Amino acid sequence: MRRTGLSLAEVAPAVGDDQVCAEQLLRRHLRELDVELTWRSALRDRLADALASARDPDHHAAVPVLMEVIRTMVLQQDYVHGYHAQEGHRLNDQAQTLADLLHADTRFPAGSRVLELGCGVGAQSVELLARNPGIELTCIDTSAESLRTAGGRLERNKTAPVRLVQADLYDLPAAEGLLKSASFDHVVICFVLEHLNAPDDALDRARRLLRSGGTLTVIEGDHGSTAFHPDSRAAHAAIDCLVRLQRAAGGDPDIGRRLYPLLSTAGFRDVRVTPRQVYVDGSHPDLAEGFVRRTFTAMVAGVRTPALAAGLSTAEDFDAGIADLLLTAEADGVFSYTFYKAVAVAA
């Protein structure tokens, strides 16, 4: 069943004698694949249009191919990884693999009003609810498709009721209603600031959504912290494709190292930042599979199409880089990556 593209977490409940459960799982997966094919077809059309426009001498004064591709179709509403089923599986694998490392100390009292900004497909939402029973969780995201996926995931995990709201962070706080100023005790942001062109503005809005004395929790990665053995120029070049696309979109793939100054400047007090290193070697085959193969390498591999379209790499070079990244997950390989977790108090 893993060969169909299902994640480990999805396959596990269907292994056994329950053929009905397995059939339901596969039928749902088939529907997700249909969505994936539709997305890829649309992506192909956008790419063709972008390349045609870039070659038109009357269009944007013959803008360079790279920038036209980025402007027209690569960024998928400024989210460099895209909104599709495979990305949803990657985010879910990431959340499960890193749950204890990132969320072991994420604790909110029962009855707390908690807001998750940019919940995506709900991968982190499930963890927040599992570790904090009794909280009143509200999740917002700009993508209706992601919210539908999040709703399904939360339902399958039989979590407590959650408010899922389609909203743009930059439109908050609202003048009235659920998302008005000072409405929450705690705000959580996971892997969102790295994609924003104005993270300082986003943090200011998060602060205004909190009551005085409420807390903000932010978790972000830092691609510049990546180190591995065997070392490989091709692997570094493939990672650099992701980094360059993200920066071209206005994001910051190394934002983890900037959390302390960002939160301090945004008006938070008692800012505490801790590094959370993922270290993988032959003694951690679970992390080699869950993080190196299914999270980090899958993330880099996910930008293959836009990277080639933008002329950042050739198919041969990019694929060689992915192959070399996978070597670091073998028994004699080593991989290291650092996340940063910040907790602060709203003044």
What would you call each of these model-derived segments?
Residues 76-96:
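Class I SAM-dependent methyltransferase Rossmann-like catalytic core
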Residues 93-111, 127:
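Conserved alpha-helix/loop element of class I SAM-dependent methyltransferases that forms part
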Residues 217-285, 294:
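Conserved catalytic/acceptor-binding region of the Class I
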Residues 200-215:
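A short glycine-rich, Lys/Arg-flanked "PGG" loop and its adjoining helix->strand segment in the class I
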Residues 115, 123-172:
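Class I SAM-dependent methyltransferase SAM/SAH-binding core
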Residues 15-71:
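Short, charged amphipathic alpha-helical surface segments
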Residues 174-187:
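A short acidic, Gly/Pro-enriched loop at the edge of an enzyme's catalytic core
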